[in-house]
Amino acid sequence: MRRDDPNLPNLCAIAEAVGDLRDRVVFVGGATAGLLITDPAAELVRATQDVDAIVEAQLGEFHRIEEQLAARGFVRDIESGVICRWIHRESRNLFDLMPVDSHVLGFSNRWYGYAVDTARPTSLGDGLTILMVTAPAFIATKLEAFADRGAGDILASHDLEDVLNVVDGREELTKEMETTPARVRDAVRTALKQLLAHADFNNALPGLIADADRTDTVLRRLRRLAS
């Protein structure tokens, strides 16, 4: 873990603030991307505005978890219009808590369940440990989000940027994907094949990654993941 990860301070602040809910929620999203980077020479990931987490809970239980958040100093971010967003009063950090079950809030990501099932304890230092998405689940959830809310816009999608950063900064990802369930592996493969076939992708790739000199490496890894 790199101490200069731009998202680490906010992630630690939220992890501290949720208290024992750390044993229940799984941290996902762009704020965790830097923790998945294993190449010490990799460029820093993008700084995110919020910290995301998911939880396996039915409607009643999810509301009880929301009540616990309120008791821990979180308030709903009404102005944002984001139904799952909270603000931590003390730190002013944004926290998006999303249920795995799409019936609870009316939306989800089909790989959230897999992300919860495969989550691993991850140390943030100073005795602080969270449950965090694995690299394969991160890629699957981000590609799903790219196709959904990003509408496949390769130039404007932070989700795609996060995928490319992890592909670039985690050499072992290809081997990790080989051991994932077939349904996840096939979905990732299909999404990446579509991405690689995009008419503008090859020309846009150098501008989508932190270090344009790594374009050939990233492209080679994407092709292996798509094969």
Task: Go through the PLM ranges and name each one.
Residues 1-227:
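Compositionally biased terminal segments of proteins
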